[in-house]
C-alpha cells in the first residue's frame, strides 16, 4: 500500500553562495549553488488524511474515477486541504456523508464517505481544520476518504495539487 505521511509545514533550506568576481567565475570553479526548492512548494492543497492510497484518479472498471481514495481507520480525522467555505454538508447518493468546500482560488474540494460530517453549510474553515471523520457511508469498499479537486465543474487529478509523498509504496489495487 502507498502510505501517506504528513510533511512538516515549514521546510527551510540554507546555502552559502559564493560572491561573483566581477561577473565571472574563476576557472575550474562550479557555478553557484541555489538553495533547493521544497518539492511541495506552490502546491495549492494539503493532504486531507494520513492513510493508504487505494485508488487513483482516472479510468476505473469501465467508468471514470473523479478523485482519489485514501483508506484509514473509521473515525480518523479528515482535514480541510485549504481554507474555504462549506457549501455542502449532507448525504449524497453514492458519496454517502460528504462535505464540499469552496476555496478563494475558484477550486472546490470534495470529501466523501464520512462516518459523520463535523461542519455545517456556510461555515468557514482553515487549512487543517477537521471537517469530518473517515467512514463507510455511500458506495465504498471499507473505511476510506474519497477526495476530489474541481475547477468549476471539471474534476482535476488531486495528486497534481498535493505535496509529494515520502517513503510511499503503491497499493497493488491501484492502476
Provide a role label for each language-model segment.
Residues 1-52, 172-175:
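Polar/charged, compositionally biased leader and regulatory segments
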Amino acid at each position: 500500500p502507498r502510505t501517506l505521511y504528513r510533511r512538516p509545514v515549514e521546510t527551510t533550506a540554507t546555502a552559502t553562495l559564493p560572491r561573483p568576481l566581477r561577473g565571472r567565475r574563476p576557472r575550474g570553479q562550479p557555478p553557484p549553488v541555489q538553495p533547493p526548492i521544497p518539492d511541495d512548494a506552490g502546491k495549492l492543497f494539503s493532504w486531507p488524511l494520513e492513510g493508504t492510497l487505494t485508488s487513483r484518479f482516472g479510468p476505473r472498471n469501465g467508468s471514470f474515477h473523479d478523485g482519489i481514495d485514501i483508506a484509514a481507520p473509521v473515525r480518523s480525522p479528515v482535514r480541510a486541504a485549504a481554507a474555504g467555505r462549506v457549501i455542502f454538508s449532507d448525504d449524497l447518493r453514492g458519496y454517502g456523508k460528504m462535505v464540499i468546500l469552496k476555496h478563494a482560488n475558484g477550486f472546490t474540494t470534495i470529501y466523501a464517505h464520512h462516518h459523520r460530517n463535523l461542519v455545517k453549510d456556510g461555515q468557514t474553515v482553515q487549512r487543517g481544520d477537521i471537517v469530518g471523520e473517515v467512514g463507510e457511508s455511500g458506495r465504498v469498499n471499507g473505511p476510506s476518504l474519497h477526495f476530489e479537486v474541481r475547477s468549476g465543474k471539471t474534476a482535476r487529478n488531486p495528486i497534481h495539487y498535493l505535496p509529494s509523498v515520502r517513503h510511499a509504496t503503491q497499493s497493488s489495487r491501484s492502476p
